Amino acid sequence: TVTLPPAALPLSGTLAGGRLTIEGQAAYSGGRLTSYDVRPTGRGLALRYPEGVRSLLDAQLRLFGDAEKQWITGTVDVRQALYTKRYDVASELLGARRALPLPDSTALEEGPQLDLRVRAPGTVRIDNNLATLAASADLAIQGTTRAPVVTGRAEIERGRLYFQGRTYVIQRGALDFVNPRRLDPLFD
């Protein structure tokens, strides 16, 4: 059995143009990880994921668990985010008609438990063929990595929506994520 005390291996460096520090501990026995408690902290991380999204964020996370159960907790503060991916309505409609494959048994495994807060105080922008808008969000992400659940609120502060050759001015809008069992937002 090997146990690394909390201050044994602090790591710090640069990741995605920002500063990343990782502290924590891990225990190994029989060549396997038996428990861990790791705290990554990122400041000014510039990400280009998923496709069409550029963001600058700060994060304080905690990853901990053992062979039976794992957790990912913490806070992500979005300093800037821009979504530019073009949206093809025809492809989406045709894609919706295809039958969805049933998940295999490995996809039904739980995965780590989530307890995350994502804060974006007026720092989210969308600029693509469907909309130009500014938004803010305060969201909680819970559930598991295989079945995440989002609760909270996202507010559209201003913008324009482009549909069938017309431009619609958005004065305000909101998405309320109130269903703790599935992603089912209410639009206002």
Predicted regions and their residues:
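Strand-loop-strand
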Residues: 1-188
